[in-house]
Every structure is written in structure tokens, then in C-alpha cells.
């Protein structure tokens, strides 16, 4: 009986040793795991605080009145900014303070890229002030005069006139389709004894339009259709004050051609 008990104890010794080895291996694995995590955290902290985490590329879209550099400065995001310190909504708030900006979307692209998508208020015209052009936006606000005289967006140019009439015209210009708005080169306020709201338009197609502020947008709806009725090369005045008709210019006998369009229906 004694011998059998001894044998049983001896059988258990290898099992105990195996268990101890397994425990030791588990401890080693955990230690390696903890050290690895700690090492990665240290690397991340070093990367976070070093210039390696700075923005490497900033792409700006939709800006006409601000340079890319100005957008970066206003947003607070530059190439000296750490990617992890960029807060998209804060950059958007900074940019929407600009009166020409309607909406902004800032996107972060890991590991070091930023995209800035800008939606500007529609430019409905340029006010000519002593030969310098001042952009007029659909929200009724004006921007600083353009430094180089170049038009960043196609829109009509007009001379300043009575503020009340300007407001009425702005409200009408906002209703125009982009195609018609881009067709207008210049708007002149030219009141007559019969019509204090009279306007003279000079179109990019080379034609002159006589119209009025009242229901201006509705009257101009027919302009693209009228163009199709004009023979190429003809100098024509398009009268949209009452109904719509064209008057040929430069001929010995000026010819009037009635066009069947009811502009106010």
C-alpha cells in the first residue's frame, strides 16, 4: 500500500511542474503585452508632441474671394498645426464669420490631411465705385473693392443709385436663374419721366435690353427665348417694358418686331 501511494505522488510531480511552467508563460505573455502597450503609448505621445503629427496637406475648394492662405489663417488650421489638435467644427465656425461664406465643411483625413469645402453667397453684381468694383452678394452685403479689378465670378456691373431702388433690384436679381444672371454684363439705372424704375441692360451677347425694376426677374425669363428669334449679326434693342419686342438698330429704317410673350402672366 505504501509503495502505491509513493507512486501516485511521483506521478503528480510532472503535472505540478507543467502547471508552474504554464503560469510562468502566462505571466511572461502578460508582461510582454503590457510592455508593448506602454511602448506604443510612449511612441504615440512622442508623435503627438512632435512636428511629425503636423498637417502635411490642406486642400481648399469653392473659394473665390479668399486665397487658400487666407482660408487657412481664418480657420486656424495651418501647416504648423498638429493633426490631433484640429477641431473641425471650430474651424467651420471661424470661417462662417466671413460675410461672403454661407457654409463650410471641414474634413480630416488621417494621418495628416485636411479638406475645406466652402459655399459662398451668390454674387449678384459688382458696384462700380470710381472705377473700382465692389462685389454685392445675395445676402445684401458688400465686400471690399477688388484689388486687381478681375471678376472672380461672372455677374453684372452697375452704378450705385438710390438705396431703396437698389434693394428692390437686389431682390429681383436673386430670383434670376444663374444662366440669365451671367448673361448680363452691365445694369444702368436710367429713369424716365414715364418710368422712374427704368433700367438699361447691356448683355454679354451684344444686345441692349430696356426694362424696369418692377417684375424684373419675371420679364427677364423670356430673354433666352427672344435670343432664338434674332438673326445672327443684327444689332437689336430688346424692349421688355410692356410685353416683349425687338427693335433693329443701325438701319436706315428701324424695324420693330413684336414677339408674342406675355412676360407678366
Curated annotation (Swiss-Prot):
Recorded hits in PROSITE patterns, A to Z, give: POTRA (PS51779)
Instruction: Name its GO BP terms in alphabetical order.
Output: FtsZ-dependent cytokinesis
Cellular location of this protein? Cell membrane
Q: What's the source species for this entry?
A: Bacillus anthracis
List the transmembrane segments: 31-51
As for membrane topology, the entry says:
Single-pass type II membrane protein
Which stretches are Extracellular in the membrane topology? 52-265
User: Which segments sit on the Cytoplasmic face?
Assistant: 1-30
Identify the GO cellular component terms for this protein: cell division site; plasma membrane
What are the record keywords, sorted? Cell cycle, Cell division, Cell membrane, Membrane, Transmembrane, Transmembrane helix
Protein name, UniProt field: Cell division protein DivIB
Q: Which residues form the POTRA domain?
A: 53-121
What top-level branch of life does the organism fall under?
A: Bacteria
The record describes the protein's role as: Cell division protein that may be involved in stabilizing or promoting the assembly of the division complex.
Family according to the record = Belongs to the FtsQ/DivIB family. DivIB subfamily.
**Presence of keyword Zinc-finger:** no
Amino acid at each position: 500500500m505504501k509503495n502505491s501511494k509513493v507512486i501516485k505522488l511521483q506521478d503528480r510531480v510532472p503535472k505540478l511542474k507543467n502547471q508552474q511552467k504554464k503560469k510562468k508563460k502566462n505571466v511572461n505573455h502578460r508582461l510582454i503585452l503590457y510592455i508593448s502597450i506602454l511602448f506604443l503609448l510612449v511612441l504615440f505621445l512622442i508623435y503627438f508632441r512632435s512636428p511629425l503629427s503636423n498637417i502635411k496637406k490642406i486642400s481648399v475648394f469653392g473659394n473665390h474671394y479668399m486665397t487658400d492662405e487666407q482660408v487657412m489663417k481664418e480657420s486656424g488650421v495651418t501647416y504648423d498645426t498638429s493633426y490631433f489638435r484640429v477641431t473641425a467644427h471650430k474651424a467651420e465656425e471661424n470661417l462662417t464669420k466671413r460675410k461672403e461664406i454661407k457654409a463650410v465643411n471641414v474634413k480630416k483625413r488621417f494621418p495628416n490631411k485636411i479638406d475645406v469645402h466652402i459655399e459662398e453667397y451668390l454674387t449678384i453684381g459688382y458696384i462700380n465705385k470710381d472705377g473700382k468694383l465692389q462685389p454685392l452678394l445675395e445676402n445684401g452685403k458688400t465686400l471690399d473693392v477688388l484689388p486687381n479689378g478681375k471678376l472672380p465670378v461672372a455677374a453684372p456691373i452697375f452704378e450705385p443709385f438710390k438705396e431703396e431702388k437698389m434693394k428692390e433690384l437686389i431682390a429681383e436679381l436673386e430670383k434670376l436663374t444663374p444662366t440669365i444672371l451671367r448673361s448680363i454684363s452691365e445694369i444702368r439705372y436710367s429713369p424716365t419721366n414715364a418710368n422712374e424704375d427704368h433700367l438699361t441692360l447691356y448683355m454679354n451677347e451684344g444686345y441692349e435690353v430696356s426694362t424696369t425694376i418692377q417684375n424684373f426677374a419675371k420679364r427677364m425669363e423670356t430673354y433666352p427665348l427672344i435670343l432664338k428669334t434674332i438673326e445672327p449679326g443684327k444689332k437689336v434693342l430688346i424692349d421688355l417694358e410692356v410685353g416683349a419686342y425687338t427693335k433693329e438698330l443701325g438701319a436706315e429704317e428701324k424695324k420693330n418686331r413684336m414677339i408674342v410673350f406675355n412676360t407678366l402672366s
